[in-house]
């Protein structure tokens, strides 16, 4: 029997760094790596997210985070408390932090087409820069406020679910 066409052999040969298990909240993410996570408190949020974020840094992956501008410093402090050298990661291009106005709410409103393009650009850029993966963490509390375009959020998430399977990168 010729095993050269055996799909199992092909998968073994295709094994790369990006095929390492990606852990989140005590589970391993599968092929679908878009997770919507809800938390009861900031402490719970960081108890779940910090090991996921740290794992990416330990593997020399890129981190791209979007946060509430009012919580920027607290977010950076939480990363530092996990042993992440944020200034070094920023200088090395391994970490980028944007606030809502520079991502979801450019020009003061949510434009789903523009946001979908940004996510694809970020994930493509990470690959082009030589990172095995980009771990994208996006805080979306802005969606609870009355920003123009927020009514398009469900459609945006649906469209995002059609785009993300093209990538191995986890998006939380």
Q: For each predicted feature, which ranges?
A:
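Non-catalytic regulatory/interaction regions at protein termini and inter-domain linkers
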Residues: 1-172
């Amino acid at each position: 029997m010729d095993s050269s066409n055996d799909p199992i052999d092909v998968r073994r040969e295709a094994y790369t760094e990006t095929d390492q298990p990606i852990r989140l909240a005590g589970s391993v993410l599968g092929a679908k790596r878009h997770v919507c996570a809800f938390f009861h408190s900031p402490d719970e949020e960081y108890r779940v997210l910090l090991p996921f974020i740290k794992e990416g840094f330990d593997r020399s992956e890129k981190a791209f985070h979007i946060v509430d501008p009012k919580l920027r410093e607290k977010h950076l402090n939480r990363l530092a408390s996990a042993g992440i050298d944020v200034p070094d990661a920023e200088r090395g291009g391994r970490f980028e932090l944007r606030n809502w106005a520079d991502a979801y709410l450019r020009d003061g409103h949510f434009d789903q087409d523009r946001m979908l393009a940004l996510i694809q650009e970020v994930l493509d850029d990470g690959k082009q820069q030589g990172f095995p993966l980009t771990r994208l963490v996006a805080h979306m509390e802005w969606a609870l406020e009355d920003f123009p375009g927020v009514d398009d959020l469900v459609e945006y998430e649906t469209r995002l679910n059609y785009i993300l399977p093209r990538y191995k990168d986890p998006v939380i």
